[in-house]
């Protein structure tokens, strides 16, 4: 009997299997994150150490809360946990993820060899394991990182089955430890991927037809006798029944828990994901049945593989006269013949065929649309476990053929060719997964009727900023599938990126017109993929660039919200718009509503902080910045802007934290000069002159024309008695910004006081007055130049005019008195001193300090409103053509105020001026 066969394998066999896997998949280590990997890895915050572990058990495979309708309801927390371990080791470097996938595939192949030993002889089981290890259909499961769900689930799937095979003791007694272990392993397999639960069916078939050796006729005979009262159920059959009941009850419990996890809701898919699922009878049934031979053909002939089989890949079968129905008929005839053979006849061969069929059929049931529609037409990676049964069937058939001496050599040649060609195909197929562009271009070679593939190639080109070429692919997608809302949205977004706003709006309007019309009393969520509602967001984001259409944009946001009150992105985008419309209180309401829907979104807390800045509530703004950083300690804009807010507050106790955040910011953004500049400003506030100099130099090195960094470095030199070092810095500043008033003032002061270059200083001050005749500081300093040139009357007249501009400046009055005293003592005849054009008090002017002050960076990044992209519910975010635009205008707050407080160096400068005027 099969159950009596040894399942042991030796080290040489393990080494051979592992070596073959390594030879086939070594090049997968050089592939990146593509297709579904983007959503599951790059965009999944559950991988980050800052996310609590319990969140893994509350969210789906893609990081979306299971309670949200946009969730795919794919509950695989243990798989996500392995991704998190990868992230802990290498963050987002893809090589470690691909390496672990390859290791898992090798482990599955070795365990599969052990399972094969239960049904096949040593040679045939090795052949089955080798066929499984090299089969090209597995490329998507192994080279695609998200395929780890299949790999992990298969490990525990096979382990559970092997455990169950040990549940039969002497004299047909029940050994409970393996059964308990089986139930545990089934639960673990199911937490890796849902199809893990189907191993229970495999165990039941094994128990009845292999372990107990029953055939279908025997079972019918016993059942008939029992029902007629002519016999009783044998003890062995009762023991079998007990084991089956335990398995069934445990399975039922797992199903109940799984249903509770998804809150009795199925995911929402569009008709583009699985067209047959929304087709009428008999189209739906004919197409679903035809998909079975399609999947079988992929196992038999994996020459044309495609990463995406949705949309128009397989045209619907709408008539019984469709020739493809012959393939369905032939498939069921072959399957039926094998089924009858395996169930009717005793013997090892029939039991091997039966177990192979069960391994092919039962794990495929969740993806078969039998009980519920799925979000794809064909998916190669779901064939990972079913291919085990296929490989057993092929190996068993080869064993039968090779036993005939006439065909023995030919069978070996054919088998060797199959294994070699499959291995080479797998190796070559891995390169297709190197990047998104190579992957989707390879798919288009197989299938040109899938609009999603055209869209995805467009996305890949879009990511490379090749918008012109991307547009061609997006337009082709609309031609292949004219009613694809997402394709039209992609066209609109690309037109926008090409600054062709009129065409962009037309494309968005066309996409909007394809949305289902209002049906009273019917929820939109039940009929529309949530991402399709982003057409309202994208259209509003486009038209709000026109100041006269802000209300129209707001109407679109409100329309989206009315259709889905839980549409978080609509609240976020509307909040941005309301800030632009100078309605911060309403913007605050919008963000608070969004936070009700997602309190763990760091970007939302950041945006709310910006609103509080607009409302002039810096303390509340800082609290919200802090909340954003609690959720995401590396949130770059929150680090930067909260540090600036602390710096502006003037509170000395906040400076260390501000410095810490800026240091974290420059670690995250080492090429951003603003971070170094603001560190320099903090150091200047703390009188750490050498440190300030170092930070300013780093900022200037990264951005040679950084106006504020250049000026403040020059100012720092002037305040630390290094005026001559300041001059070349000022020359550089004025080369880029020849009208920089403060730079001209500082340069003039240094030329006059340090270089004694009176004409040079005079040119600086005169240029200031050419640009701004009312500049008090420039005019006052020009008066000092006149005094230095011994033009006392001119100096007096100049000071009178300056006093008219700033009548309350005591130092100007004092300097005027000094000049007049000098005129009197020198005996110069005094001319009438009427103000030049203005008299004091005739015009109200801004009071301008006479001393140099620090200039706060005008290049320093203003606070920005962040847009939050939550379009993960299409597993392929690249294909998720419905994404809201990423480049909406950023909302800025008022420019950061200049620091007006007088500094010690400025006081020294004033003393120097008075010393000159006193003739000392």
UniProtKB/Swiss-Prot annotation:
Stated role: Transfers mannosyl residues to the hydroxyl group of serine or threonine residues. The 4 members of the TMTC family are O-mannosyl-transferases dedicated primarily to the cadherin superfamily, each member seems to have a distinct role in decorating the cadherin domains with O-linked mannose glycans at specific regions. Also acts as O-mannosyl-transferase on other proteins such as PDIA3. Involved in the positive regulation of proteasomal protein degradation in the endoplasmic reticulum (ER), and the control of ER stress response.
Mode of membrane association: Multi-pass membrane protein
Gene3D superfamilies according to UniProt: Tetratricopeptide repeat domain (1.25.40.10)
PTM-bearing positions, type Phosphotyrosine: 508
Similarity remark: Belongs to the TMTC family.
Name of this protein: Protein O-mannosyl-transferase TMTC3
Residue intervals on the Extracellular side: 36-94, 193-198, 258-325, 380-381, 429-920
Carbohydrate attachment residues: 499, 546
EC number(s) on file: 2.4.1.109
A GO BP entry: positive regulation of proteasomal protein catabolic process
Region (Disordered) residue spans: 829-897
Matching SMART domains: TPR (SM00028)
UniProt key word Amino-acid biosynthesis: no
Residue ranges, Cytoplasmic side: 1-14, 116-125, 164-171, 220-236, 347-358, 403-409
Source superkingdom: Eukaryota
TPR repeats: 451-484, 485-518, 534-567, 568-601, 602-635, 673-706, 707-740, 742-775, 776-809
Enzyme class: transferase
Record keywords, A-Z: Endoplasmic reticulum, Glycoprotein, Membrane, Phosphoprotein, Repeat, TPR repeat, Transferase, Transmembrane, Transmembrane helix
Bias (Basic and acidic residues): 840-858, 887-897
Metabolic or biological pathway, per its Swiss-Prot or TrEMBL entry: Protein modification; protein glycosylation
Annotated compartments: Membrane; Endoplasmic reticulum
InterPro entries on file: TMTC_DUF1736, TPR-like_helical_dom_sf, TPR_rpt
